[in-house]
From Swiss-Prot:
Gene: pyrH
Catalytic activity line of the entry: UMP + ATP = UDP + ADP
Native source species: Methanoculleus marisnigri (strain ATCC 35101 / DSM 1498 / JR1)
Pathway(s) this gene product operates in, as recorded in its UniProt entry: Pyrimidine metabolism; CTP biosynthesis via de novo pathway; UDP from UMP (UMPK route): step 1/1
Places the protein is found: Cytoplasm
This protein's name: Uridylate kinase
SUPFAM superfamilies xref list: Carbamate kinase-like
Cellular component GO terms held in the UniProt record: cytoplasm
């Protein structure tokens, strides 16, 4: 059974504790788990940025802010595990070795952040390489990779397809401080390039987009892979 790693943005899973999409994602992930082995890396989203903002206002440095962000990603991961119930391994994986060990149970493996100064997108890329994943999916708050931030620039154009090299060129200037909200960090981009693992960037605000991409082979977003290949099922 092929392995798929999903980088699930905290802002799409848990926009706030009062308004979250956990139940919707639980339904879709359970359906998908019958077709492939799933690893989910959960981001911190707005909750992490709020904690980081308060920590900075209190004089905390970037290292402390990073640690706070990682804690929040793991709390979000714990919420997803609670929703998945028996479909998920009951513990949050805290490193790549644990993720591989937990996968032996045949259940969905969920983790959050691991390393300070790295986004959960970078964690998901390294995880995909570690487990030999066939596909990496970034479910985020926009429907693909754009020429500029579509939330700020009405003229931004979505890239339907990119090579790993082109992706790296786009993200070279991404911010790397704690809580940064960019399409991918440069670590993720470099791992994607060296591993050759294809990447889909899609709109995670609708969890069904995961099912459409993985099961039906339909991705309205950006496909990152070498020219002449396609990661989508036919």
């Amino acid at each position: 059974m092929k392995k798929i790693v999903i980088s699930l943005g905290g802002s799409v899973l848990v926009p706030s504790l009062e308004s979250n999409n956990i139940d919707r994602y639980v339904s879709v992930l359970k359906k998908i788990s019958g077709t492939c082995r799933i690893f989910v890396v959960v981001g911190g989203g707005g909750e992490a940025r709020r904690y980081i903002g308060v920590a900075r206002s209190l004089g905390a440095g970037e290292a402390a802010a990073d640690e706070l962000g990682i804690m929040v990603t793991r709390l979000n991961a714990r919420l997803l595990i609670a929703g998945l119930g028996d479909a998920a391994y009951p513990r949050v994986a805290e490193n790549y070795t644990e993720a591989q060990e937990f996968a032996q149970a045949g259940k969905i493996v969920v983790m959050g952040g691991i390393t300070p100064a790295q986004t959960t997108d970078a964690v998901s890329a390294v995880l995909a390489e570690s487990v030999g994943a066939a596909l990496l999916i970034n479910a985020t708050s926009v429907n693909g990779i754009y020429s500029a931030d579509p939330k700020k620039d009405a003229g931004a154009v979505r890239h339907e397809r990119l090579t790993p090299r082109e992706l790296l060129d786009i993200i070279t200037g991404s911010r790397m401080d704690a809580g940064a909200n960019t399409v991918l960090d440069i670590v993720a981009g470099k791992v994607i390039e060296r591993s050759g693992i294809p990447l889909l960037v899609l709109d995670g605000r609708d969890p069904e987009n995961l099912y459409r991409a993985i099961v039906e082979g339909v991705c309205v977003g950006t496909v990152v892979c070498e020219e002449g290949s396609t990661p989508l099922p036919s």
